[in-house]
Every structure is written in C-alpha cells, then in structure tokens.
C-alpha cells in the first residue's frame, strides 16, 4: 500500500485529493500539509504546518496542489528526499519544468507534473491535435472560477502548443495573421499563445474549469469543449498518476502517456 502525503491539503483541490486518497483501498493518507490551514482537520488527520512532516510520515508519494512559488521550493525537497511527486499546481513555466527535469533526473524519486488531471480535458487536447492540420484557424477560450490566480490557464497554453506542434508535424503553414486592424479596446483579441493561437480567459464565480476550442475553415467551424463541473472530475487522473509515478523514471509532463494516448 502506497503512503501518500498531500501538500496544499487545506485548499479546495487539496481536500478533494485527501478524500480520494483516503477512500482508495490501495492507498493510505499518511500526512496532510498546509501551513495556512495548520491544525485543521481533513479526513481525520490534523493538517501539519511544515513540509518536514512529509519525512516523518514516511510518505512514498506526495501530491502537491499548493501555489507555484511553494512548488518551486518544494520540488528540490522531494527530489533530495526520494519522495515521488505528483504536482497539479498551475502557473509553472517551461523553465520550471526544465529545472524539475534536472532535479528528478538525478534523483531516486520520480515526478508527474500536469496542468490538468481531468481525463476529458486530456482527450480534448488529443482531439485538437487531430483537427489542427485540417482547419484554417483556431482560438481557445478557457473559463475558470474567480479564485484562479494565473491567466491564461496552463491547460489552454498546453492545448495551443499541441495544436501548433500538430500543424508543424503535418507540414501545414502558419495560422493566418490576425485580421484585426483597429483595436478599439486593448486586449480584446486575447493573448497570442504558442504557434500564434489566440487565448482568451474568463474568470467568474460559479465556474470550475472549462475549455472551448473553436476551429474555423471556409464555410464551417468545429467546436471542441470540455467542462469540469466538480473537482471530483480530476481525481481519477490524480490517482492514476499516484499509482504510476513510481514506475515512470525522471519527470513526466502531463498524463497523456499514463493513459496511453
């Protein structure tokens, strides 16, 4: 049975991860850590104040859903301590991923870092890769709850990168230039992501995590959309990563390879 620690355990995602781990018959919730929530209860455990509790609990795997700055500090601790890591925090840059790859290349521990653990969202990206070479234009709209700090989301950036890579691999030319010649309001056309894919962010109460990818071609459009209505939608992917990370040397980015797609 794998002993699992959860960092960021007092947040909404962290508490959901604790519940999922506690309910899994092959996993044991060994420790919950979250300094701002220290002393609170989650799944019958008292939330610990500091990362040192991870070693004391002899956790095999840690799931980190804290904030990006904390993850940057925590990853070297996991790598040096030989604790396998599953990270779902957004806001990590390509440079952060490169640093993590170096850390875990020289570690006895492995890591999985994913922008989105919802299996439907991963499938959306795969469907977008299939569509990208056959359509003339594309834009991405991501919609999240009003407490999300980063914009655009990691999932939307990853989607744009996947679309750009699929077009390049197929030998398709670049996306058409933005036809806008008069910007009445600054930012109205969103941000330019990888491969020139336009990214638009929406933040509203009542939302969880949603993404809509709109492809356009002469006389037609194709819309691919995924909606997470509940944080439980992420748990199958999180648990898959927890169970798989011990057998995935070094750093794995995304859960696509864990799903075999």
PLM features: what roles do these ranges have?
Residues 1-4:
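Extreme N-terminal starter segment of soluble prokaryotic enzymes
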Residues 7, 65-66, 88-89, 114, ...:
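Structural motif
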Residues 7, 12-56, 136-261:
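C-terminal substrate-binding/catalytic lobe of Rossmann-fold NAD(P)-dependent oxidoreductases
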Residues 29, 47, 85-86, 110-111:
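Hydrophobic beta-strand scaffold residues
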Residues 55-61, 65, 69-88:
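Rossmann-fold NAD(P) dinucleotide-binding segment
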Residues 68-69, 91-92, 116-117, 204:
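Short glycine-rich anion-binding loops that position phosphate/pyrophosphate groups of nucleotides
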Residues 75-76, 80, 89-111, 122, ...:
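Rossmann-fold NAD(P)-binding glycine/threonine-rich loop
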Residues 84, 99-118, 136-141:
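Rossmann-fold dehydrogenase core element
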